[in-house]
Amino acid sequence: MNVRAAAALTLAAALAACGPPEPDPAPKPAPVKAAPPSEVKVSSPTLDAVRARGRLNCGVHQGLAGFAYPDQRGVWRGFDVEICRAIATAVLGDAQAVNFVPLAATERLNALQEKRVDVLSRNTSWTFSRDASLGFDFPAVTYFDGQGFLARRSLNLASADELSGARICVQAGTVTEQNLAEYFREREVKYTPVVVASEEEAREKYQAEACDAFTADISALASARSILNDPASHVILPTVISKEPLGPVVRQDDAVWADIVRWTVFAIVLAEEAGLTSKTVEQARETATRASVQRLLGKRDNLGAMLGLKPDWAFQVIRQVGAYNEIFDRNLGPRSSLRLTRGFNRLWTADPPGLLFAPPMR
């Protein structure tokens, strides 16, 4: 190396040494710490309104066997009805503190938007547009369904694709109507839609042979078939043309209320996971040693305070209403007239597994 090159290198090293110091590394963010439950401040206009009223206003179907219907004494029964009762229990401590508001499909979302009801529990599908643009939240799925077709067994149909030229009853103002049109358009199958105002009217027209088939959620078809004159003469075709995640709906302007509804549903699922029932939960609250069960039943950590609820809110829900499997079995399953199988509504831990899942309560 010549003298000039060596001098240049020496000068460069000197300049580098005199340059600005390296900046200090950015400070690490402090870890996120949850405030103790008792110190969490809860603000929910809906919760305040329900407590001031002393009753939950819950929107339900006008009459759908298995899901929502008044019995001969005028007492509301059904799967969706019991979800209402579970929410009322969580918030008010009383499963009977519910005003049931029967709503047609065309008015159900308006009723929620206008605050005529606090929550909608009316076999309503969770869709992108309802969630993203209409100002609603879907806290949890209570029933995984799909759209199907009811037809007379005498037609010997193997699938819905054989309904070319058929008259098909469908309820107005529903996702069902849109699914029907898209399905047959994509398959270039011609049909005649018989659009009616309610599922009851669709069933009556189908019974009177004013239409050849009836399309709705499969659970609704099972409900309709159970009250036809001769249920065995009708079959639900194996074709399923959509996925319909059904569950309660709330307004998007109250995050705490959405959490209350969400975790009420999760509580009845967690109860089934833990093997708890309305008959065993009182003893379990006294004897449970598993931390997850103690938290669920309010024996430790007081998680309910984070939602403005009492420590034993989930315990009361399970004691007064039941675990998910109890609610399903008596309204839709083997103890009901519908005798539906659990299908996708099995627990994720079942064999074979279903889609029913609840995050950990901790």
Question: Model segments located where?
Answer:
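C-terminal motif of bacterial Sec signal peptides marking the signal peptidase cleavage site
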Residues: 14-17
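Extracytoplasmic small-molecule ligand-binding "clamshell" domains
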Residues: 29-121, 309, 324, 347-348
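Extended ligand-binding regions for polar small-molecule ligands
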Residues: 19, 29-41, 82-85, 89-91, ...
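Acidic, polar ligand-binding/catalytic clefts
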Residues: 85, 89, 93-162, 218-240, ...
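Sec-exported extracytoplasmic/periplasmic mature domains
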Residues: 51-55, 88-96, 113-117, 154, ...
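C-terminal functional modules
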Residues: 303-362
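Bacterial N-terminal signal peptides that target proteins for export
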Residues: 1-7
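Bilobed "Venus flytrap"/periplasmic-binding protein-like clamshell domains
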Residues: 57-66, 76-91, 125, 145-201
